[in-house]
Amino acid sequence: MGDRGGAGGSRRRRTGSRPSIQGGSGPAAAEEEVRDVGAGGDAPVRDTDKDGDVDVGSGHWDLRCHRLQDSLFSSDSGFSNYRGILNWCVVMLILSNARLFLENLIKYGILVDPIQVVSLFLKDPYSWPALCLVIVANIFAVAAFQVEKRLAVGALTEQAGLLLHGVNLATILCFPAAVAFLLESITPVGSVLALMVYTILFLKLFSYRDVNLWCRERRAGAKAKAALAGKKANGGAAQRTVSYPDNLTYRDLYYFLFAPTLCYELNFPRSPRIRKRFLLRRLLEMLFLTQLQVGLIQQWMVPAIQNSMKPFKDMDYSRIVERLLKLAVPNHLIWLIFFYWLFHSCLNAVAELMQFGDREFYRDWWNSESITYFWQNWNIPVHKWCIRHFYKPMLRRGSSKWAARTAVFLASAFFHEYLVSIPLRMFRLWAFTGMMAQIPLAWIVGRFFRGNYGNAAVWLSLIIGQPVAVLMYVHDYYVLNREAPAAGT
């Protein structure tokens, strides 16, 4: 056979045909391949065509088709392209939620009623207490401005200014809380919105006071470099720089109050123009997502919450867990939509209108592998304020990092409870407890979970933790406002 192969090879050479080894056919080629395998240990890699199929060529002598390799799902394989599995997960998620949606429609019918939403804001169409509260907030902004004007010219001492600012800031928190708690005509939703406005005003005026104080301290240290001090105080980025005390104008104050940030600067980064198409997209997103959230709450969450009251009353723990898991899906979906609506659509729309240049309102919190990373990246405006006006000042005063972090969580827990308990007119401290529980949870996740496991733990805390707080408050509110009056009659 070897001689015949050799003769065949020489005959092809004489007739001008291609060599047998190029086509991979013939016993000689096969024998050569066997020798190569014996020397190298692996089968030669076959040529492939443009579709990825092996180029068969003119022969049929495939003596070896196996090689040393791992399965794709093995960690040693190095394979990482699971795009098809991700698409499968998305398809399964859509199908499972479509089934839940159809089940909900069959069981309850269409519950979406946009007109009913108006009643959440107004009890009396001729009485708008929440809007009146928001308008009154201007008084506190003007008061802070007047204090700063007098401090700038030396008409007030720093101690007197600190006292006046403290009284003003304390009143900002106490005044709307008293009105919301005592005024019967204000609705819980209207109360929440008014208290959110006052909370934002509190944080902004706190920052306004701090930055102007830093400017005065630098001016006192080097009066000859007042303009440079004002530039350094805000980070040194501006097309048209303003120095202290030239920043103390109503125009500057109200630009800051409406800007999508909580941290004051003398010179904010500004975008060159308003992009009309970008702004229109954000406005359409705001409109669509608002309607979507209202529809999901009315159609999906409200029935789930109502059906959860009986298991809580009977203390049927298995049914409570089942209702909790049933509520977790719509609650988490609405929370994700709310995040996009607020931090991307709304804040970008406001920033575009005001040509506010810093658009970092969130970072990649969805990749969080620890609870700490999540809280540092999901709400950048609040995070920047906490670092600049709370965390770093505590460190400069000698506090430890652990004490400063605990104080930040404590302040956050207070404001969460402030925005929930006062509108509902009941104090159960569920929101406060939930926020303070983040401290040991952050330690546990950081200590025992890494990588994808840490990310899964963060997602699990978001998906399960929020519905627990929602059910606690709804149950207590239901008992307080439904069963108590019925028992009294």
Curated annotation (Swiss-Prot):
* Residue positions of the active site: H416
- Provide the primary localization: endoplasmic reticulum
Q: InterPro entries given for it?
A: Diacylglycerol_acylTrfase1, MBOAT_fam, Oat_ACAT_DAG_ARE
Instruction: Site Important for catalytic activity: give positions.
Output: E417
Region feature Involved in homomerization, mapped onto this chain: 1-88
The cross-references to Pfam families, in alphabetical order and at most eight, read:
MBOAT
Q: What is its EC number?
A: 2.3.1.20, 2.3.1.76
Q: Which GO terms describe its biological process?
A: diacylglycerol metabolic process; monoacylglycerol biosynthetic process; triglyceride biosynthetic process
Q: What intrachain disulfides are recorded? A: none
The portions of this protein that span the membrane are 81-115, 128-153, 159-181, 189-220, 275-309, 317-354, 401-421, 430-448, 451-482
Region described as Intracellular loop 1 (IL1)? 225-277
Using the record's annotations, give every residue carrying the modification Phosphoserine.
S20
- Sites where the protein binds an acyl-CoA: W375, Q376, N377, W378, N379, I380, P381, V382, H383, Y391, R405, Y478
Region called Extracellular loop 1 (EL1), residue ranges: 116-127
Q: Which comment does the entry carry about domains?
A: The disordered N-terminal region is required for the diacylglycerol O-acyltransferase activity and may regulate enzymatic function via its interaction with the MBOAT fold.
PANTHER family documented for this protein: DIACYLGLYCEROL O-ACYLTRANSFERASE 1, STEROL O-ACYLTRANSFERASE
Cytoplasmic side residue ranges read 1-80, 154-158, 221-274, 355-400, 449-450
**Motif FYXDWWN motif, which positions?**
361-367
Q: Which source organism does the UniProt entry give?
A: Bos taurus (Bovine)
Region of interest (MBOAT fold), residue spans = 128-489
Name the record gives this protein = Diacylglycerol O-acyltransferase 1
> What spans are recorded as compositionally biased (Basic and acidic residues)?
44-53
Q: Does the keyword tRNA-binding apply?
A: no
> Which residues are on the Lumenal side of the membrane?
116-127, 182-188, 310-316, 422-429, 483-489
Q: Which UniProt keywords apply?
A: Acyltransferase, Endoplasmic reticulum, Lipid metabolism, Membrane, Phosphoprotein, Transferase, Transmembrane, Transmembrane helix
